[in-house]
Amino acid sequence: MWVIYIISKKQLLTHPGQYRLPTSIKCIGYVFCAIFYFKGLFIKPKDSFGKRLTDCFYDLGPIYIKFGQTLSTRPDLIGIEVAENLKYLQDKLPPFDTKIVHEKIESKFGKKISDLFTKFDEKPVAAASIAQVHKAQLKNGDIVAVKILRPDISEKYERDMQFLEFGAKIVSTLIKKAKRLKPKEVIAVFRQSMKFELDLRSEAAAASRLYDNFINDDSLLIPKIYWELTSSDIITLEWVEGVSIYDKDKIIKLGLDPKEAAAKIAVIFFNQAYRD
């Protein structure tokens, strides 16, 4: 019901922007509006469809934020205007309680935080849709990043994926032109990628393999994995300072050439493809 309420509030089915929806879909949209957002029957949205879709994903939470980010990479499927809006979909959410962080770590590894770390920052350095990251120091002095999945994220993932799969079936059935976009296949691929993200052992294994492949290559630094402090919902890895690839000003301030950096990234990408 919450999903339908948000879709109705954003008027996605009644005012779909540049998209031409079948009359049957629009009628369903108006019925939803009448039930969940009555005033939407009498007012037109001020924002573009792309902006409203972005807001909708954000309001619906972690899995939808990830799905929106995935869609943003496919302007060929959803159109340039919508893709550009979805690029601004921030993967940032309020952090969950540090008490829960302590409980998860201590129950998983059978030791108190104080026995595992010399320092453990209570405030996360990043809180995203799937997990949050805390900076810490091990007993041997190593500075590490500890990434912990959000509580109940796996249950929310399964619930939200079932709704997305249901939505894909509806779209495939009612919108004939949408079949060529293969919505059910898109959701299936998304399910697989999310399955990978929700098991941090997979992320750790991929990082370890990459570390081995680039061990004699100084063009790329892969953080070391601390396997003794890694599980399906917690990963501990070497702390590495860095700058976002999107922060062009900081990159230039560091004395780097953005074009040269982009070229190196391209080479690294192809090296991964050939080495793996």
Q: Predicted regions span which residues?
A:
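Broad phosphate/nucleotide-binding scaffolds in NTP-utilizing and phosphate-metabolizing enzymes
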Residues: M1-Q272
